[in-house]
Amino acid sequence: MVDFKSIETFLWVVTLGSFRGAGQRLNTTQPAISQRIAQLEREMGVKLLNRDHRVVSPTPSGRQLMLYAEKLISLRAEMMAEIGDRSAMRGVLRLGVAETIVHTWLPQLIKSVNTAHPNLSLEIEVDITPDLSTRLLAQEIDLAFLVGPLSASGVRNRVLCDYPIGILASPSLGLGNRTLKVQDLAKFPIITFPRRSQPYEIVRSLFNRPGLSPIRLHASASLATVIHMAVEGLGIAVIPASIVENELADGRLQLLSTDLKIPPLTFSASWLESPDMLAVERVVDLAAKIAQGSAVIADASDVDAPRSVVQF
């Protein structure tokens, strides 16, 4: 009798092109994957996979089986969504996260997932959006929260929230009592997101103007480092103000009023289409609800205003 687990294993071997990838996806060993495939081929009585090349590919019989495997996995996900107990969902979900989310609502999401799906484990990796995009398309992660949406074949997106970019500095710099022009800001080192990130390129272009001397642009992959440098008065930070609410509240940083127009960062959940997307979609639903309640501060005039809620 054909085992459902063997069908699922076959689907992921074909989808990922390797036994190793399927093992990582299903949180098991490569020998266990090989054993399941061998058992499935014995029960079906045909060869299902070509193993002669670096990338495993389905035989003609394997391609036929793949059509049924996708239907079966999809039906199982539909059945679990309609009938199954949410707490019964189990497995490992590989989540890639941009650091801005780490500093805002990721802890709340983890708590919500633990409560709603106690048997679902999250493997969390923090990286910049370009690398998260690459890893998602390579199927090394199942879900990414990144600056998006991501435009690529087979990718599904859901916008989560917008974070306006703030111009922030230590009060020790004495910049908080007037509206600053770009020439005023350019006199100080500018501290922001790492190279290859969208915010870095935006900041670089804003200060790349005729008649303006080259700025000292400090880029860091660690937002904690950016915040620390700004608090110490080492420069002006250009980051979302929402991630430094504590520093703003206790006076270690202040939000500067400027004539710069910087577009907000739009964060989205991005994942690949798959017959088995139930766990991903449940986590995305939780993330959307939490992100929708994130506070945003646009500029210095908003510091004393009531919190606004990001709407979809």
Regions found by a protein language model. Give the residues of each.
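Short helix-loop hinge/linker segments at domain boundaries
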Residues: 46-48, 52-56, 63-64, 74-96, ...
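Hydrophobic hinge/microswitch elements
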Residues: 128-132, 137-140, 147, 201-256, ...
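N-terminal helix-turn-helix
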Residues: 1-67, 101
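Secondary-structure junction motif
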Residues: 189-210, 277-284, 293-302
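Central regulatory/effector-binding core of bacterial HTH transcription factors
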Residues: 90-153
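Flexible hinge/capping segments at coil-to-helix
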Residues: 152-195
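Beta-alpha-beta core module
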Residues: 153-159, 163, 225-274, 282
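Short amphipathic alpha-helical coupling segments at ligand-binding clamshell hinges
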Residues: 61, 65-67, 105, 202-203, ...
